[in-house]
Amino acid sequence: MSTTSRVGSNEVKMEGQKRKVVSDPTHVTLKVKGQDEEDFRVFWVRRNAKLLKMMELYTKMRGIEWNTFRFLFDGSRIREYHTPDELERKDGDEIDAMLCQQSGFGPSSIKFRV
């Protein structure tokens, strides 16, 4: 089963996990893997389309707002305005989707004894 989301001239297609990756000069197939190793989605994206559409679709499928995830490729953050061509992505490249974790250690949590 595959679903397609089309917004303007940008197209993002999500394919089932067992589909074979097909090479296309105008599109690239990207795998997005969540923190749990079992969960991954395959997207067929135009090479010149901003990755925001893919990010929104992935997070919508997970039921979480897109800005709560950080998308990484080889440890480098991918922003919503990047395109696969700008990042020189190839068919089958894997993108990691990590939940944003914010923590801090501030002065109010430190107690000194004199």
From Swiss-Prot:
Keywords (A to Z) from UniProt: Cytoplasm, Isopeptide bond, Nucleus, Ubl conjugation pathway
UniProt-listed InterPro entries: Rad60/SUMO-like_dom (IPR022617), Ubiquitin-like_dom (IPR000626), Ubiquitin-like_domsf (IPR029071)
Gene3D superfamilies: Phosphatidylinositol 3-kinase Catalytic Subunit, Chain A, domain 1 (3.10.20.90)
Keyword Plastid: no
Signal peptide boundaries: none
Segments for region (Disordered): 1-20
Crosslink (Glycyl lysine isopeptide (Gly-Lys) (interchain with K-? in acceptor proteins)) position: G104
Cross-referenced PANTHER family: SMALL UBIQUITIN-RELATED MODIFIER
Assembly: Interacts with SAE2, SCE1, SIZ1 and MMS21 Covalently attached to a number of proteins.
Cellular component, GO annotation: cytoplasm; nucleus
Subcellular location: Nucleus; Cytoplasm
Protein purpose: Ubiquitin-like protein which can be covalently attached to target lysines as a monomer. Does not seem to be involved in protein degradation and may function as an antagonist of ubiquitin in the degradation process.
Principal place of residence: nucleus
Domain Ubiquitin-like intervals: 26-104
Descriptive protein name: Putative small ubiquitin-related modifier 4
Additional notes on this entry: Stress conditions rapidly and substantially elevates the amount of SUMO1 and SUMO2 conjugates with a concomitant reduction in the amount of free SUMO proteins. The SUMO conjugation system plays an important function in stress protection and/or repair.
The organism's place on the tree of life at top rank: Eukaryota
Pfam family, one: Rad60-SLD
Keyword hit for Chloroplast: no
Family (UniProt): Belongs to the ubiquitin family. SUMO subfamily.
